[in-house]
Amino acid sequence: MIEFQRLHKSYSVDGRQIVALHPLDLRIGPGEVFGIIGHSGAGKSTLIRLINRLEEPSGGRLLIGDEDVTALDSQGLRALRRRIGMIFQHFNLLSARTVAGNVAFPLELVGTPRAEIDARVAELLARVGLQEQANQYPAQLSGGQKQRVGIARALATGPQILLCDEATSALDPQTTASVLQLLAQINRELGLTIVLITHEMDVIRRVCDRVAVLDAGKLVETGPVTEVFLHPKHVTTRRFVSEAEHLDEAELHRDFAAVGGRIVRLTFLGNGTYEPVLGRIARDTGVDYNILSGRVDRIKDTPYGQLIVALTGGDQTAARAGFVAAGVQVEDLRV
């Protein structure tokens, strides 16, 4: 368990106090993949770097298990950091070392015997799929391969927590997907707690269990990804979701003006996503429907679908009740 208790961070710039992170309370459970999303300057990197005290808090407490991280001395902090791995947006690899040498580096720093280092490096390179690149140098690797080296290096000391600071921001979409699949696999197989920061809701949707949304240094929304993604409450969260779904709200409302009838958003979750509910209810109630927007996808391992439809004619009250009875969430956009 990682627990933030009124933790906050301020800087002094030219005699002025700049608040990077307002006091917040947050819990991250053991074995979770927890996402933190926000625009540039929202406080994401500050928050994640408080966990291993690369940033020093201005106040509040941070607990990892029963240990108060904010009270640790230098010796305790070194021990803590061996239990926390970290990967970065720009990889931070040592250019003069081979792939194997980069992965070995944290183990060399703590005096691990060479035979153990060699065995551990071989194991980690197999885990991230880079056995063939062991003797290559970072300049010879693709961006995705460099990040896989970063992941292997972060796992070298057997951490309990993995911090990912914009780990996919420098990668193309296909490589991003493969790196996220690797992180999900590591979470499943090793039981690591993963804390991931990003400015992309699509990254959160693919891999995270829960999410916190930051805006101007404040925690504005948090909860399970399915709930936050499908029913965003704060305006910042709604913007992130619209960007992920490639929805232009202004354009959508112009479409509303061009059609008649009652307009609703239908949300399907789980196996019901693939049931022919809309057609069945239309037949049963005599309601005609016009699909204005639609999407079927997954939130981590859970299928979901969203349709925005215009309903005309028939018994629309019965149709609405039929959707609810079938487990479909109904939101009226225009009655």
Curated annotation (Swiss-Prot):
SUPFAM superfamilies: ACT-like (SSF55021), P-loop containing nucleoside triphosphate hydrolases (SSF52540). GO terms for molecular function: ABC-type D-methionine transporter activity; ATP binding; ATP hydrolysis activity. Residues 2-241 form the ABC transporter domain. It is an enzyme of class 7 (translocase). Its main location: membrane. PROSITE patterns: ABC_TRANSPORTER_1, ABC_TRANSPORTER_2, METN. It is a peripheral membrane protein. It comes from the Bacteria. The complex is composed of two ATP-binding proteins (MetN), two transmembrane proteins (MetI) and a solute-binding protein (MetQ). This is Methionine import ATP-binding protein MetN. The lineage of its organism: Bacteria, Pseudomonadati, Pseudomonadota, Gammaproteobacteria, Lysobacterales. The gene is metN.
